[in-house]
Regions:
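Solvent-exposed, non-transmembrane regions of membrane-associated and secreted proteins
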Residues: 1-177
Length: 177
């Protein structure tokens, strides 16, 4: 099952974190190398651009990006095989290194699978205990504090068009968003 496959991938990351000094350095650019815990997975699938994890949930997944096939991972697993669950992926026009807003897509499935666990944020106490999302790029660890939670109908004229905002012209525009 796909859930077991995600657990195996997460186990590889955790094992690499524990064995960090033994992992080979994999250069991504002249200036940056891939973090040791993600090197093996990147070699397995270079569409991987990061990792998302939220403590207290099952969210602990690789994050993919395929600009030329934007929704590829909506219905494909990490091994690029067909899968109803897919893999979380970043919107095609987001630049992982410089965009102000990274839109990460993933299925909302009941029973806490995939991003279904985000429903827990309806509970103020849960939010109070889980205010941080870990999102690592291949080269940097990152932690982000949740400042808002909303539910909207995507691509609806009445919905919040979060997917239209990638970069702000200035700080005021970013804050207004």
């Amino acid at each position: 099952e796909q859930t077991e496959a995600f657990e195996e991938i997460a186990d590889k990351v955790e094992q690499a974190q524990e064995d960090g000094s033994q992992a080979p350095e994999i250069p991504l650019t002249e200036e940056e190398s891939i973090l040791p815990e993600y090197g093996e997975l990147f070699l397995q699938n270079p569409d991987m651009v990061g990792w998302i994890k939220i403590e207290g949930t099952n969210i602990n997944y690789p994050v993919m990006q395929t600009p030329n096939e934007p929704n590829f991972y909506l219905k494909h697993n990490f091994e690029k095989e067909y899968s109803d669950l897919g893999v979380p992926y970043i919107q095609e026009d987001c630049d992982i290194a410089s965009s102000d807003n990274l839109v990460i897509y993933g299925h909302h499935i009941k029973g806490q699978k995939m991003f279904g666990a985000l429903e827990s944020y309806k509970d103020k106490d849960f939010y109070g205990e889980h205010k941080v999302i870990q999102f690592d790029t291949l080269t940097q660890h990152g932690e982000y504090e949740i400042i808002a939670v909303f539910k909207t109908v995507a691509y609806s004229s009445e919905g919040f068009r979060y997917y239209d905002f990638i970069n702000a012209e200035n700080e005021d525009e970013f804050n207004a968003y």
